[in-house]
């Protein structure tokens, strides 16, 4: 398995690919009045490269109008940082052709940065005694201040509950931290007062975690422990950021006031959609008094003053300013972007709308506020061999195709290294979003984020040969791959992926493949799961195939539930018709759906809430817990086909205790009184439940999964199962 992506080998592979047609050059020492045909200014400085991207684009347009560039063109961008005042946009008139693409690339091995930022300079010591008194004594000698307006920066953006980031500060190539308390980790909501003038959220009646209060119920106030806020000056623009009720949903909330005597915070509407719940995590931010560590900064938006404690040895700073994509391809086709770094913007690095056969390859996306690349519409657009990290939102959006006709969009993300993303919004952001029909994500390395890896929203997607690890590090009830709540999202294949070291602090744990809320018609095959939490979760859906996977030290390897018969029965009793409406929206009873997915014709039978026709065959599992079955008392597990698996886990089955009444609570580890039992390997009931499978103790023959070796030992029980070997050496990015 390839564990590391050596970016520069990929850059040289992609950016060094041959490009035909006329060659042009852009340089920081160029001039848009020149021909752009020289790589450097001529001796007499009468000709040379262009100076700007826009200048080169406009010159190419003129050449095409004259009938030139029929073989395409290559625009070589010389090294340096190019600050963009506005989005660099290419439209249909800038397109290449199949035989003559237009390539915009970094010249040879030179490093090219397209930046949406501005330098922040003119820092001085804090001399205002009123400000100095608010700083901690240890910070006063280190904190500097500058007026952003003479720096040419007047738009600071706004902090909104679920929007992208406003102005951010970078120094030494790293994102700096808005002054916060606590500096690391989280505070906890001490309580949520249950009285007031306005009840903003009635809460979730079925989930009462503490003191009999429905989760999320609030009157716009929370309380805190400790005395720290008593030091802070009221009236400054203070915020809190937290996971307010669920560990899969965060938001920023502005503080209206703090009653330090009662240790009570009144929050300014709009409030978090799921309310506020006792003991949930949060921290305070944008508080001058908490600017107390190197790398922290505070912005007084009213005065335009930025306060900063620079890290040792750092003398430069840059603020993100451009609140638009750095580069946009609008209806453009046969265009390639290669070997370029996109940095310091508040939104996407590259946005592609419509058009076809565009590629972004061997590029670096970092220190951005939005997604790295957003592809919306068009056909056959892709992102290849790019390094995406330290972006405020997600990595790559693949959106396209026509769902009603099942026409594929054919977008792809291949051979990318995507990590340390979702730095601003901590949930709802992904390494890759697949939306529409017929996209593929393959040979990527995805790791280290607070939330999930890939979201699937559509049909006929393929996710293969990817490695996922250390995801969901701050969250819970989340999966490395996540989908759900639409019966028509079918035909998706998840195969030959490696999931390992998945663990999060949040409620409900984390999953490898999360087929949430009745996701149906998925194939999960040939995957490797090592310490991957609840490795494969079937959340009430049907027609899913979980075949020929290896599970090691997972808890559990496979989860099956019938939530539609329990806590989520309101999806089937007429309270909401969401699932059925989505089927009608796709005209499921007529072609192409009736032919491609004939199982949909049976979804409205007499028992649509029962997880029928799931198939779990030929898997190997050991060292953890084989299966959790929730709502166990509500349905007959025999509707799920479970056979020919090698099961060697210490615990075979986790289910609700006999005699327990009511819905399965699904709470997991709140008060340890949930009424679940674990049936060990050797238990007679568990043996009966899983008859038709080979139940063993100890390693059944997987060679050395702790070292990433999942090959099967010859003549072992696992090998004799007839297991089809997983092509493990092909997993992850190609090239080292």
Question: What feature does the model see in each segment?
Answer:
Residues 5-13:
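Bacterial N-terminal signal peptides
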Residues 16-21:
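Boundary at the C-terminal end of the N-terminal hydrophobic targeting segment
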Residues 25-354, 359, 366, 582, ...:
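Extracellular polysaccharide-degrading/modifying enzymes targeting complex plant/algal/animal polysaccharides
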Residues 97, 347-351, 369-376, 389-708:
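Glycine- and acidic/polar-rich repeat regions and solenoidal domains
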Residues 382:
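Core nucleic-acid recognition elements
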């Amino acid at each position: 398995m390839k564990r590391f992506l050596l970016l520069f080998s990929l850059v040289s592979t992609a950016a060094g690919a041959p490009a035909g047609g006329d060659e042009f050059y852009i340089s920081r020492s160029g001039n848009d009045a020149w021909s752009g045909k020289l790589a450097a200014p001529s001796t007499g400085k009468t000709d040379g490269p262009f100076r700007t991207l826009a200048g080169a684009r406009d010159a190419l347009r003129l050449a095409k109008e004259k009938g030139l560039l029929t073989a395409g063109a290559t625009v070589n961008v010389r090294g340096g940082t190019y600050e963009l005042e506005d989005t660099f946009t290419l439209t249909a008139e800038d397109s290449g052709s199949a035989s003559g693409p237009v390539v915009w690339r970094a010249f040879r091995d030179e490093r090219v940065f397209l930046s949406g930022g501005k330098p922040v300079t003119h820092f001085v010591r804090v001399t205002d005694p009123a400000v100095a008194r608010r700083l901690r004594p240890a910070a006063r000698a280190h904190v500097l201040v500058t007026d952003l307006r003479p720096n040419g920066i007047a738009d600071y953006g706004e902090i909104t509950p679920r929007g992208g980031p406003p102005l951010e500060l970078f120094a030494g190539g790293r994102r700096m931290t808005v002054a916060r308390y606590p500096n690391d980790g989280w505070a906890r909501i001490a309580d949520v007062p249950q009285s007031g003038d306005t009840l903003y959220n009635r809460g979730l009646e079925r989930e009462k975690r503490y003191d009999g209060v429905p989760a999320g119920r609030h009157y716009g106030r929370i309380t805190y422990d400790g005395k720290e806020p008593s030091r802070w000056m009221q009236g400054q623009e203070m915020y809190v950021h937290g996971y307010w009720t669920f560990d899969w949903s965060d938001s920023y909330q502005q503080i209206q006031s703090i009653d330090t005597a009662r240790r009570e915070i009144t929050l300014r509407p709009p409030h978090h959609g799921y309310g506020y719940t006792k003991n949930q995590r949060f921290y305070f931010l944008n508080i001058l008094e908490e600017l107390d560590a190197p790398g922290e900064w505070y912005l007084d938006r009213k005065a335009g003053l930025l306060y900063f404690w620079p890290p040792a040895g750092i003398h430069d700073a840059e603020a993100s300013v451009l609140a638009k994509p750095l580069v946009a391809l609008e209806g453009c086709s046969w265009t390639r972007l290669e070997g370029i770094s996109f940095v310091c913007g508040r939104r996407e690095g590259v946005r592609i709308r419509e058009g076809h056969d565009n590629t972004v390859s061997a590029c670096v996306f970092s220190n951005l506020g939005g997604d790295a690349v957003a592809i919306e519409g068009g056909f056959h657009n892709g992102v290849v061999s790019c390094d995406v990290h330290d972006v405020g939102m997600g990595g790559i959006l693949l959106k396209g195709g026509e769902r009603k006709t099942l026409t594929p969009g054919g977008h792809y993300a291949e051979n990318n290294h995507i990590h340390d993303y979702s730095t601003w919004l901590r949930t709802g952001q992904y390494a890759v979003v697949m939306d529409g029909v017929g996209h593929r994500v393959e040979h990527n390395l995805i790791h280290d984020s607070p939330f999930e890896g890939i979201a699937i929203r559509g049909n006929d997607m393929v996710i293969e040969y990817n490695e996922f690890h250390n995801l969901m590090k701050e969250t819970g009830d989340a999966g490395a791959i996540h989908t759900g709540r639409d019966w028509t999202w079918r035909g998706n294949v998840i195969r030959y992926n490696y999931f390992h070291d998945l663990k999060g602090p949040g409620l409900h744990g984390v999953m490898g493949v999360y087929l949430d809320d009745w996701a149906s018609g998925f194939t999960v095959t040939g995957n490797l799961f090592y310490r991957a939490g609840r490795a494969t979760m079937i959340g009430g859906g049907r027609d899913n195939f979980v075949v020929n996977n290896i599970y090691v030290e997972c808890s559990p390897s496979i989860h099956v539930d019938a939530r539609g018969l329990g806590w989520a029965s309101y999806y089937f009793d007429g309270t909401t018709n969401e699932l059925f409406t989505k089927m009608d929206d796709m005209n499921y009873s007529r072609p192409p759906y009736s032919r491609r997915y004939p199982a949909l014709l049976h979804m409205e039978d007499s028992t649509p809430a029962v997880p029928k026709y799931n198939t779990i065959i030929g898997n190997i599992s050991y060292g953890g817990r084989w299966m959790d079955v929730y709502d166990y008392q509500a349905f007959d597990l025999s509707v799920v086909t479970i056979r020919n698996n090698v099961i060697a886990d210490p615990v075979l089955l986790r289910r609700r205790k006999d005699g327990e009444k009511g819905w399965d609570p699904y709470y997991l580890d709140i008060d340890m009184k949930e009424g679940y039992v674990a049936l060990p390997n050797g238990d007679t009931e568990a043996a009966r439940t899983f008859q038709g499978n080979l139940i063993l103790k100890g390693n059944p023959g997987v060679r050395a999964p702790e070292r990433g070796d999942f090959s099967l030992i010859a003549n072992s029980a696992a090998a004799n199962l007839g297991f089809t070997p997983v092509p493990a050496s092909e997993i992850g990015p190609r090239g080292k």
